[in-house]
Amino acid sequence: MLSNLRILLNNAALRKGHTSVVRHFWCGKPVQSQVQLKGRDLLTLKNFTGEEIQYMLWLSADLKFRIKQKGEYLPLLQGKSLGMIFEKRSTRTRLSTETGFALLGGHPSFLTTQDIHLGVNESLTDTARVLSSMTDAVLARVYKQSDLDTLAKEASIPIVNGLSDLYHPIQILADYLTLQEHYGSLKGLTLSWIGDGNNILHSIMMSAAKFGMHLQAATPKGYEPDPNIVKLAEQYAKENGTKLSMTNDPLEAARGGNVLITDTWISMGQEDEKKKRLQAFQGYQVTMKTAKVAASDWTFLHCLPRKPEEVDDEVFYSPRSLVFPEAENRKWTIMAVMVSLLTDYSPVLQKPKF
């Protein structure tokens, strides 16, 4: 019947000399997806297919539309509790997770090193089992990826990586949602990384090719990404027909790039290396000189907090900078992660183009 109505309206419009006026009807019913993530851990995007990552971004866009745009209240996590373990301090990760989980009707519990010492006062195995009996999921922001792996192995609930020495997957989800909103699609974009070969770069390397994105990365000598991760990223690039290049020249990495990306030069726990790192990263500041060799539609991303030596004010506060929409999207993407791992909810919004 809906199909017949579409045909009648289109024919009527054509008879009056107009082009087709009815293209699609969206009834607002949940869209059934083949992707099922409930009960999974999110430790690294290496463990997820392109379709699965797309699903989390689709769900992010759906929640953002329904809650922010339409003003709906969606208690999808009512009765659920989240354990938040933070060995490292945070603004965006903590705020986005606490407010997002609560907005969906759930109860987040924040634990610092004053409350819990992973593997110190209690073994990781025991901690994982206790958390499994009292919460529905755990988000952990830790120094060592190996601690996350142990928690995931011993727990019977989903474990989410809020940041580790190797990966920061939830940040990359926010980055990709921001880019999809700005460009309309991710496929074919060239990402230009200029900075440390750190957890952010590692997470991009584990996912960009799955969306058909190219990656050009510049890091100082001695600060390159993990060789094992590079090897796997090369495999992903080959499988997906994308380009991956590594260099020590920032301008070479920026050349033709759609998205200029950098991050802190000195991560938490590296404070003793500050003088050495500042010297090694000379010439890596993102400026308008960097942008001049980028694509004409270039934009800029930084996961924050930002220091002026990493990117100057002219770029950081320019209309091309997407850093603050990127920060806001941390909330919508972590909400989507929790909903996908803890519920059977399906998006209502039509799937965006990726």
From Swiss-Prot:
Record-given protein name: Ornithine transcarbamylase, mitochondrial
EC number(s) on file: 2.1.3.3
Keyword set, alphabetical order: Acetylation, Amino-acid biosynthesis, Arginine biosynthesis, Disease variant, Mitochondrion, Phosphoprotein, Transferase, Transit peptide, Urea cycle
UniProt xrefs under Pfam families: OTCace, OTCace_N
Record carries keyword Transport: no
PANTHER family: ORNITHINE CARBAMOYLTRANSFERASE, MITOCHONDRIAL, ORNITHINE TRANSCARBAMYLASE, MITOCHONDRIAL
Residue(s) carrying N6-acetyllysine: 70, 88, 144, 221, 231, 238, 243, 292, 307
Organism from which the protein derives: Mus musculus
Modification Phosphoserine occurs at: 133
One function term, GO molecular function aspect: phospholipid binding
Superkingdom of the organism of origin: Eukaryota
Assembly mode: Homotrimer.
The protein's role, per its UniProt record: Catalyzes the second step of the urea cycle, the condensation of carbamoyl phosphate with L-ornithine to form L-citrulline. The urea cycle ensures the detoxification of ammonia by converting it to urea for excretion.
Originating gene: Otc
Pathway annotation from the record: Nitrogen metabolism; urea cycle; L-citrulline from L-ornithine and carbamoyl phosphate: step 1/1
Residues recorded with modification N6-succinyllysine: 70, 80, 88, 144, 221, 231, 238, 274, 289, 292, 307
Family membership noted in the UniProt record: Belongs to the aspartate/ornithine carbamoyltransferase superfamily. OTCase family.
Entry keyword Transferase: yes
Modification after translation, per record: Acetylation at Lys-88 negatively regulates ornithine carbamoyltransferase activity in response to nutrient signals.
Record SUPFAM superfamilies: Aspartate/ornithine carbamoyltransferase
Residues the entry annotates as binding L-ornithine: 141, 199, 263-267, 302-305, 330
